[in-house]
């Protein structure tokens, strides 16, 4: 399962949220956790100091880092955005569209705390694990 940035942020903030507990449980159970390159990028820019970035990099490298399929994921992300807009929902983040395109391409769900993924689920058939 792909874990979106929104879930990682909850986990890294050590909150007692549903998302934080869910990810902690998956890690403890040694479940498959997929980290898209763009999610890794977002998490590495989240703090300005290099020590925190290095800690996050080491944490994320324990999991499956999934590369983008450059042209295919870009085209599919644009199509997802257009389809959602035609359906009356504007996805706020193109990175969410890229993550969704990757998830659809590799056949996995996305765990998230972001309403954009539910719009994508509605219009594009993305499998999701909402953790609000």
Curated annotation (Swiss-Prot):
Tell me which Gene Ontology terms the entry assigns under biological process. negative regulation of growth; response to hypoxia
- Residues binding Mg(2+) are 96
Concerning what turns on (or off) its expression, the entry says: Induced by hypoxia.
Q: Gene3D superfamilies given for it?
A: 5'-nuclease
Q: What is its EC number?
A: 3.1.-.-
What does the activity regulation annotation say? RNase activity inhibited by EDTA.
Does the entry feature the keyword Phosphoprotein, yes or no? no
Residues engaged in binding Mn(2+) = 96, 114, 116
Q: Name one Pfam family in it.
A: PIN
* Alphabetized UniProt keyword annotations: Hydrolase, Magnesium, Manganese, Metal-binding, Nuclease, Toxin-antitoxin system
Q: InterPro entries recorded for this chain?
A: PIN-like_dom_sf (IPR029060), PIN_dom (IPR002716), PINc/VapC_TA_RNase (IPR051749), VapC_family (IPR022907)
GO molecular-function annotation terms?
Answer: magnesium ion binding; RNA nuclease activity
Mind telling me which SUPFAM superfamilies this protein's record contains? PIN domain-like (SSF88723)
Q: Record keywords: Secreted included?
A: no
List, for all copies, the residue spans of the domain called PINc. Answer: 1-121
Superkingdom: Bacteria
Q: How is the cofactor bound?
A: The heterotrimer binds 1 Mg(2+)-Mn(2+) pair while the heterotetramer binds 2 pairs. Both metals are shared by the toxin-antitoxin pair.
Provide the cofactor list for this protein.
Mg(2+); Mn(2+)
What is noted besides the main data? In this enzyme the conserved residue Asp-4 binds Mg(2+) via H(2)O.
Q: Which HAMAP family match?
A: VapC_Nob1 (MF_00265)
**Family, similarity comment:** Belongs to the PINc/VapC protein family.
Subunit and partners: Crystallizes as a VapB15-VapC15(2) heterotrimer and as a VapB15(2)-VapC15(2) heterotetramer; each toxin pair forms a homodimer which creates a channel in which the antitoxin binds.
Give the protein's biological function. Toxic component of a type II toxin-antitoxin (TA) system. Degrades total E.coli RNA, which is partially inhibited by cognate antitoxin VapB15. Upon expression in M.smegmatis inhibits colony formation, which is neutralized by coexpression with VapB15.
Name this protein carries in UniProt: Ribonuclease VapC15
Name its species: Mycobacterium tuberculosis (strain ATCC 25618 / H37Rv)
Highest lineage ranks of the organism?
Bacteria, Bacillati, Actinomycetota, Actinomycetes, Mycobacteriales
């Amino acid at each position: 399962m792909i874990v979106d940035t929104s879930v990682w942020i909850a986990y890294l903030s050590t909150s007692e949220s549903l998302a934080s507990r869910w990810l902690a449980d998956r890690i403890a159970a040694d479940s498959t956790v997929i980290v898209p390159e763009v999610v890794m990028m977002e998490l590495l820019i989240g703090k300005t100091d290099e020590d925190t970035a290095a800690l996050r990099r080491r944490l994320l490298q324990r999991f499956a880092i999934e590369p983008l399929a450059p042209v295919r994921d870009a085209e599919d992300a644009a199509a997802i955005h257009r389809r959602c807009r035609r359906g009356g929902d504007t996805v706020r983040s193109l990175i969410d569209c890229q993550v969704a395109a990757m998830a659809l391409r590799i056949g996995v769900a996305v765990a998230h705390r972001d309403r954009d993924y539910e719009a994508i689920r509605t219009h594009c058939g993305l499998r999701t694990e909402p953790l609000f």
